[in-house]
Amino acid sequence: MKNNSVLNNNFIDLNLKSTNREGVLEELTDILYENKIIDDKDGFLKDVYIREYAGSTGVGNHIALPHGKSKYVRKASVVVGRTNCEIEWGSVDGLPVSFFILFAVPEYGDVGIEGKIISSICIKLADDDICRLLLDAKSNEEVFDILYDNN
């Protein structure tokens, strides 16, 4: 199994069942909770929604980067999901979203190398070709390799 300090294959689900924003965020949060990254699902989700209401996290190219800085996060982590349908997210390019990268960041403390990895993911998503590769990925390993190539 491929892994690093913020993501492993258990944190990637390319078959999310949800058809709306709330469902996607709940499914991704469940992954964090099941892997003991967060202590409280409802508390973390509340913090994610606070950020969502502040402005859209749809960055374009059918990708959204919801995130929460929360006291319920034990360790900075990333969880990735993809739906088979497109979901309206209020993205900057007006396109619906089907690929999601949820960042979970502790409210306090230094995120160190985890913060650098998260930052490098955001930089990669400025590349349209990288976005297309993620949307077309066939496996968790492929997603991992795309996100962490040269990290």
Which role fits each region the language model picked out?
Residues 1-151:
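Cytosolic covalent-transfer regions centered on His/Cys nucleophiles
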